[in-house]
């Protein structure tokens, strides 16, 4: 592993209804970046916020000699789509992603940059003393285990978005045009050298988590379908096993009927109904998984954009865009020679 020279650092932060957190987020993130011996930009992607977040981001970007870049999406597309929009607009040799809720400290940015300079393609983080509820922690552990087995990359916390990516990894992810993606997994599929570090995890001080139960379910399906096609293979195995169990159980029912007569279980009606419901449920599970894959393939075949950037604001210069492929030379904040 060879050292990786870094001249310019980009920070990408997706924002959705974080009006109360933004002033502290902007202050702490800029202060952390000023500790770097590199030029930097802080790309803030507004993911269709309905509060005052958009106005706050634009004012920050319009400030004279501002290191902030405001990327305004026309509606809410989700956290990972917003990060990809930030990836398209940033130009750093290393790109760091960070959540806007301040549960992960921006002060860790210099440490991640130093690790990236050592030659790591991806620098992940593990939340120590995680301050989420148990119903969020346990599913996360199961997902991390499933991802490790599917990708072969042993990382312990795929849910923590405080991460550093080498430019080549970011470019590789941008070349992937699928609509449903999970960035940490996608990055690790291209990375050769990865590492993880422990970071603090604070309680959310303002607002609530933007991951509702339905969003978590959608995220789970994104994880399943972007990692592997193994569930499709499992369908045939499960179907064969269920059919075999059905035959054996039917034979058992016949034997019991011959021995004890038809009255032993209500003429067998309730047992047959139970068996019918079990196997029907299994079929619907399989059909649902198959439908998820087909639906996502349909979305990819249509080749619609994953997001639409309404406006880009950088250093008092709002730039309207007509497509997601608009390119603007990034503002380079000269905080160090």
Curated annotation (Swiss-Prot):
Gene name per UniProt: arnC
Q: Where in the cell is it found?
A: Cell inner membrane
**Which keywords annotate this record?**
Antibiotic resistance, Cell inner membrane, Cell membrane, Glycosyltransferase, Lipid A biosynthesis, Lipid biosynthesis, Lipid metabolism, Lipopolysaccharide biosynthesis, Membrane, Transferase, Transmembrane, Transmembrane helix
User: So where does this one cross the membrane?
Assistant: 235-255, 270-290
Q: Does the keyword Transmembrane apply?
A: yes
InterPro entries xref list: ArnC_tfrase (IPR022857), Glyco_trans_2-like (IPR001173), Glycosyltransferase_2 (IPR050256), Nucleotide-diphossugar_trans (IPR029044)
Q: Which organism is it from?
A: Pseudomonas syringae pv. syringae (strain B728a)
Family, per entry: Belongs to the glycosyltransferase 2 family.
Protein name from the UniProt record: Undecaprenyl-phosphate 4-deoxy-4-formamido-L-arabinose transferase
An example GO biological process term is: response to antibiotic
The answer to whether keyword RNA-binding applies is no
Q: How does it sit in the membrane?
A: Multi-pass membrane protein
Q: Which GO terms describe its molecular function?
A: phosphotransferase activity, for other substituted phosphate groups; undecaprenyl-phosphate 4-deoxy-4-formamido-L-arabinose transferase activity
Q: Name one GO cellular component term.
A: plasma membrane
Tell me, in one coarse class, where this protein mainly resides. membrane
Its biological purpose = Catalyzes the transfer of 4-deoxy-4-formamido-L-arabinose from UDP to undecaprenyl phosphate. The modified arabinose is attached to lipid A and is required for resistance to polymyxin and cationic antimicrobial peptides.
**Catalytic reaction annotation:** UDP-4-deoxy-4-formamido-beta-L-arabinose + di-trans,octa-cis-undecaprenyl phosphate = 4-deoxy-4-formamido-alpha-L-arabinopyranosyl di-trans,octa-cis-undecaprenyl phosphate + UDP
